[in-house]
UniProtKB/Swiss-Prot annotation:
Region called Required for interaction with MAPK1, residue ranges: 1-18
Residues bound to GTP: 23-30, 71-75, 134-137
Entry's family note: Belongs to the small GTPase superfamily. Rab family.
Organism of derivation: Rattus norvegicus (Rat)
SMART domains xrefs: DnaJ, RAB, RAS, RHO
PROSITE patterns documented for this protein: DNAJ_2, RAB
One annotated Gene Ontology cellular component of this protein: nucleus
Function summary: GTPase which can activate the MEK/ERK pathway and induce cell transformation when overexpressed. May act as a nuclear scaffold for MAPK1, probably by association with MAPK1 nuclear export signal leading to enhanced ERK1/ERK2 signaling.
Signal peptide segment: none
Location relative to the cell: Nucleus
Record protein name field: DnaJ homolog subfamily C member 27
GO annotation, biological process: intracellular protein transport; positive regulation of ERK1 and ERK2 cascade
């Protein structure tokens, strides 16, 4: 006679993962980790010397995760120390200070360093990246707005969070989403799940918005040579308008970029006979 007692569900196997932090010195990498793991903020700045290592356990969907965290020093002096720790990583916390443009501009350099150290057989597509726009509590000194940071992250398929290690804002949500994404990666055969947001706009749109942000004048913004004809200006404008119109483009910063293009066209046509 068969028993009607339901079979006991086997507990999911625990996971052991490796996470590293990356970013310039003084952007708050260690403070973010301490805020999450120790529920405290260290106001006195103490630079990380080489590598700080810690272990924490978390629960993700009834699964125990043992997280090995390697907090890497951001100063170039420690390159020879940290370059040994890039391999066999499942997750990367990439941090910049919203009040330091240099730290934001350096994100590409950090990715390049990691790619170089992983070598030709390393695959960064199988690693979960989360970008932390840190120190949002210092709003008076902010120079990188959310749309610019989010665009950089999402166009690469990375997670993006606005954080403050001082107040704790965004920290728990960031780590929870980060760990869930790593579990998804492990359960997906080591392949990073596709971020939904990154599929909603094209690389061309993202690159165009970045170019418009950094343009020095209206000519450069429209992508035409100084002294271009009225017809050339209008042609360039129409192409950009189709690409960036807020009704068609959902990329972060698209509305501001579209307005900038409209203003650039107006300014140029005033001076063209």
């Amino acid at each position: 006679m068969e028993s009607n007692v339901p079979k006991r569900k086997e507990p999911l196997k625990s996971l052991r993962i490796k996470v590293i932090s990356m970013g310039n010195a003084e952007v708050g990498k260690s403070c973010i980790i301490k805020r999450y793991c120790e529920k405290r903020f260290v106001s006195k700045y103490l630079a990380t010397i080489g590598i700080d290592y810690g272990v924490t356990k978390v629960q993700v969907r009834d699964r125990e995760i043992k997280v090995n965290i390697f907090d890497m020093a951001g100063h170039p002096f420690f390159f020879e120390v940290r370059n040994e720790f890039y391999k066999d990583t499942q997750g990367v916390i990439l941090v910049y200070d919203v009040g330091q443009k240099d730290s934001f501009d350096a994100l590409d350099s950090w990715l390049a360093e990691m790619k170089q150290e992983l070598g030709p057989h390393g695959n960064m597509e199988n690693i979960v990246f989360v970008v932390c726009a840190n120190k949002i509590d210092c709003s008076k000194h902010r120079c990188i707005d959310e749309s610019e940071g989010r665009l950089w992250a999402e166009s690469r398929g990375f997670l993006y969070f606005e954080t403050s290690a001082q107040t704790g804002e965004g920290i728990n949500e960031m780590f929870q989403t980060f760990y869930m994404s790593i579990v998804d990666l492990c359960e997906n055969g080591g392949k990073r799940p596709t971020a939904n947001s990154s599929a909603s706009y094209t690389k061309e749109q993202a690159d165009t918005i970045r170019r418009i942000r950094t343009s020095k004048d209206s000519w450069e913004m429209l992508g035409v040579r100084p002294g271009a004809s009225r017809e050339e200006v209008n042609k360039a404008y129409r192409k950009l308008a189709v690409l960036l119109h807020p009704d068609k483009c959902v990329a972060p910063g698209s509305e501001d970029a579209f307005k900038a293009v409209v203003n650039a066209r107006t300014a140029l046509l005033k001076n063209i006979k």
